[in-house]
Each structure stands twice: as structure tokens, then as C-alpha cells.
Amino acid sequence: MDVTKNKHDIVHRIGFLPQGFSSFDRITVRETLQYYSRLFSGMKSDVDGLIELVNLKDKAKEQYKNLSGGLRQRLGIAIALVNNPEVVFLDEPTTGLDPRARREVWEVLQGLKKKGKTVILTTHYMEEAELLADTVAIISKGEIIAMGPPGELIKNNTNYLVLTLQSGDESVFGVVHKMGFEPVLSNHKDIKVRVEHTDDVLKILNAIRDAGALYRGLDVRNPNLEEVFLKMTGEALLVDSVGGKGKE
């Protein structure tokens, strides 16, 4: 469909929640949805249904100014749905929310999927993309560099394990760095390195023991979407590295 020639049809077929969404302070959740629904002529929105969909039934009479960040985002999603769109665009809908509020928004988005809505979501949280998305597009410098189901992206772009060492001992980083393993993340608390085999884990642990260094705990797991993103974009999460910068 030509967007320039069919603007009216497009507006009625899509919904959009911008990043940094805000609304009118002194009107209630119900009044807010009623207001936005009136912007679409010839349509009658199911306001009660939208309130229930985003789990705001007990907040329907609450003014916008009294809502928490998570509740505001859920209201924003409801606003994006007032015209019953075929496709919903959500720009960073969980940015700045605490973990509990983020998960509440995730539940709403999963509910949209169950209702058959097509949701296009932008996010910097790879955990969020891995959990919610059927298809992920990784964008770097304005270009799509990879696209596919999260599981396939991980499987096709990784052939290693991730070892996490919980350590307050700065000498642990020096041991790992000297052995030449590729770091994923390093700070004063955790060291994450990529290893090809479980035998490499034993080599690292033995080297740490021989050096007299200490660690509090360890974890070995398969890579996740965040590691794929870092690998494919060439970006790193190395911060406060001890003994020099890690590889990027």
C-alpha cells in the first residue's frame, strides 16, 4: 500500500506508542481512552475491553498524574489500540521501568500476541526481545544485519559457551586475560568469557587455583541473544576492566 496516497487508511490500520509517552495529568484512565477514541471518526472503541486487556480495571478512575511508570506504559499501549489496529508499533515500551513493571508490560504484550495482533517492538533489552519476539531484526548503524527467530540467530551465530566467574579478586581477570580467552563482560564483580569446550572451563579454574586467586561462584551456560548482538555489531560491554581493556 502506498502510504502517501492512502494516509487515511494507514492511520486507521496501525497503532503507535512513542518512547517517552505522556498524557493529560488530570483526566482518568477511562477518560483518556475515551478522548483518544474520539480522534478516530466513525469508530467506537471498546474502552472497557481495552482497560481489561492492559490490566487497569482497578485504576480506571485514577488520574494519569497518579499512575506509576509501569501503569502509564500500559495505558499507552491501550491508547495505541483504540482504533483496533492490525499492526501496533511500540518504541522502547519498557525503558526506565523497574523489573516488576517491565514484566507486567511483557504480560500485556504476550496477551496481544494471543489475540493475533502484529506487534513491532523496538528495544535495547535483548532479554525482552528473546522472550517476546517471534522474529528479531538486529540493527547496527541504521542497517539490518541479521533477522530471524531468536533461537535460530543464537544457534547460527554462536559455537561457544559462556563462563561467568563471580569474583571480587582483581587477579582473576589477570589470569583469564593472560590465557587469551575472549571476554564478553568484565567489571569488579563478574567476569564473563567465551569458551569453546567444557575442558576450557577446567583449564581456567586450574589456572586460577595455581595463581592463588579466589572466586565466589561460577556459572556455565549457552549464549543468549545479547551475546549474539555484541558479536554481530562489534560492540562490547567491557567496563572497568582490571589490568587493561579487554578485546572488542
Language-model features and meaning:
Residues 1-9:
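ABC ATPase NBD Q-loop/coupling interface
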Residues 34, 38, 44-59:
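Conserved ABC ATPase "signature" region
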Residues 63-70:
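Conserved ABC ATPase signature
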Residues 77:
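Hydrophobic anchor residue at the start of the ABC signature
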Residues 84:
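Conserved catalytic motifs of ABC-family nucleotide-binding domains
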Residues 88-91:
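Catalytic Walker B motif of ABC-type/P-loop ATPase nucleotide-binding domains
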Residues 106-195:
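ABC transporter nucleotide-binding domain
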